[in-house]
Amino acid sequence: KRNYYPWLSIMLCICLNANAQSIIEYDIVLSGGRVIDPETKLDAIRNVGILNNRIAQISTEPLKGKQTINVSGLVVAPGFIDLHVHGRSNVEQEYQLHDGVTTALELEWGIEHLGKWYESRKGKALINYGASVNWPFERFKAIGKYQKAVDSLMQLTINGEANIGAMTNTILRAANETITADALNQTLVNIKTSLNEGGIGIAAPIGYLPKTNPNEMYQAYKLAGELQVVVFSHVRNPDIISIQEAIA
């Protein structure tokens, strides 16, 4: 005697699932787009139901929505994460949004006065944001004699200025200086402080400070190893020795 109950249960579940999709009213439905999901390898035409700002359903069946957007001929995909941006205001973020970027991170150069910058972006940013610790700035700050310039950079940070040229030109005034042991120790303290303020690793763009004593860079990498944080390196020179310095 055949037992049809398991098959009947499966069919009922399929029917109930399809019926539930048609009953639920999603906040937004993206209809008919080419859905690409790198995690599951999905690459097909689907309808996407969004509920409470989250993707609640991806289906071949029509979905009901308070707002339905026909995205036929367009790609629907997770937002891109850009790891190397220098723009830090909503002007740049608007362009990034149009490119499909939903997270923009300043990791190669980092951001000065990092804690203050995070505060200045709270509730204002259009997309997700973050930054690494700006090693050249923490070094510049530790030298001591540039306090007036450090303070002036604070105002640029709070105002959300995106003038990377003004910032780098200010900080790089100390690029060729050999710093004291005390200043080096203070640099490491400054880096730790900024990491605690939310720094996503340490930016080490030594290519902009190529005359820096190798021990300075070594100590920064050593600190990163002790704290188990990532280093984003713009190497000293375009050669093998500089690569070895970064990975030693």
Region spans (language model):
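Active-site core of metal-dependent hydrolases
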Residues: 202-248
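Active-site beta-loop-alpha junctions enriched in small/polar residues
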Residues: 86-88, 109, 134-138, 207-209, ...
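A conditional alpha-helix N-cap/helix-loop micro-motif detector
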Residues: 86, 183-184, 213
